[in-house]
Regions:
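Pyridoxal 5′-phosphate
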Residues: 1-367
Length: 367
């Protein structure tokens, strides 16, 4: 039996999305910037997708920038803003951001002389608006705080943070909403930039969006033609962009459709873990639980993998390198014994039972 419990890392492709994408691949291969009929048709479908995505988030069509994923979108938002406004050198982020955000700030700090304030989460795993307010300076250009943490599932009140930043002239607010799309609502009214990936919501890998309000000016990170309003050059991955609208629609529909079922899976998992593991965090995203066991994570991962169960011990973006887990370290959790379990509506109660039973067997053997 194979059980996939690493849904915050990536998700399976929705059958409807896959079917549409394959149909497009068979019928359309022309450049969407071409002026002949097939090129014009592809461009029109891409722009319709852009409009649907914009309507979903309550923004304007020209505020949707297609990218290769959230990592690129984060890099474009952060570096693109800094390179456009080099006169302001202070930035604010958190210590537990996704590596694409954190390492962008580190690069700006180490190679371009920026002064970066890294906020630590509170004991409940949150970055508050008050923390941001206290860190703001007259020369602060950008604040970037994620909506949902990908290691523990802590949900930050990014709307409140955005309100604080909005009152500070010349400062912009960016949030990575990758782990929240289709799970946690977000109001972008006061948020200047937001980014997400399709593959976290049963879409295609290599597909993402930067939502950038019209008044935000960025320098391109990828230079090229005038695609994506001149700030993201290169031939458009039009077919991927086209199916992203459908991916997002399905994710939003499933948010309510499967809510009660996901609550049941969550409660089943928590009840089964109480006697076998220490629950490090269960105060945020209900589909993500971080636990510790008496057995080292590497041993647990291999033992679970041998039984067909896939979980993580850290963010996949840092899993093949010996990188310090900034999130767990900030909360005083020993990463050497921690496991991240995440699920979605494609998982069954039988799979959760199998995981709990197998976990207990492994602990009885190694603990």
């Amino acid at each position: 039996m194979k059980v996939y419990l690493d849904a915050v890392s990536t998700t399976s492709l929705d059958p409807e999305v896959g079917k549409t994408y394959k149909k497009l691949l068979d019928e359309y291969y022309c450049n969407s910037d071409a002026l002949y009929d097939d090129g014009v048709a592809i461009y029109a479908m891409q722009e319709k997708s852009r409009s649907i995505i914009a309507d979903t988030f309550g923004v304007k069509k020209d505020e949707i920038i297609f990218t290769s994923g959230a990592s690129e979108a984060n890099s474009l938002a952060i570096k693109g803003l800094c390179f456009r406004h080099p006169e302001r050198k202070h930035l604010i982020t958190s210590i537990y951001e996704h590596s694409s955000v954190y390492n962008s700030f580190r690069q700006l700090e180490e190679e371009f002389g920026y002064d970066v304030t890294y906020l630590d989460p509170d004991k409940d795993g949150h970055i508050s608006a008050e923390m941001v307010k206290d860190a703001l300076r007259s020369e602060t250009l950008l604040v970037s705080i994620m909506q949902v943490n990908n290691e523990i599932g802590a949900v930050n009140d990014v709307e409140s943070i955005a309100e604080v930043v909005k009152k500070h002239p010349g400062t912009y607010f960016h949030t990575d909403i990758t782990q929240g799309v289709g799970k946690v609502d977000v109001d972008l009214k006061n948020i200047d930039m937001a980014s997400f990936s399709a593959h976290k919501i049963h879409g295609l890998k290599g597909s993402g969006v930067l939502i950038k309000k019209g008044f935000v000016n960025l320098s391109p990170i990828i230079s090229g033609g005038q695609q994506e309003y001149g700030i993201r050059g290169g031939t458009s991955n039009a077919l991927t962009n086209i199916v992203l609208a459908k991916t997002l629609r399905i994710a939003m529909e499933n948010k309510d459709k499967y809510h009660d079922y996901l609550v049941q899976l969550h409660d089943q998992l928590i009840d089964g873990l109480k006697d076998t593991a220490k629950i490090n965090y269960d105060k945020g995203l209900m589909t993500l639980v971080n636990i510790s066991t008496p057995v080292q994570s590497e041993v647990m991962l291999n033992a679970l993998n041998d039984k067909g169960i896939m979980v993580s011990s850290k963010s996949t973006c840092g899993s093949r390198k010996n990188e310090l887990n900034r999130t767990l370290n900030a909360l005083g959790i020993d990463e050497n014994y921690a496991l991240r379990i995440s699920f979605d509506y494609t998982n069954s109660k039988e799979e959760i039972d199998y995981f709990l039973k197998t976990l207990k067997e492994i602990l009885n053997k190694y603990a």
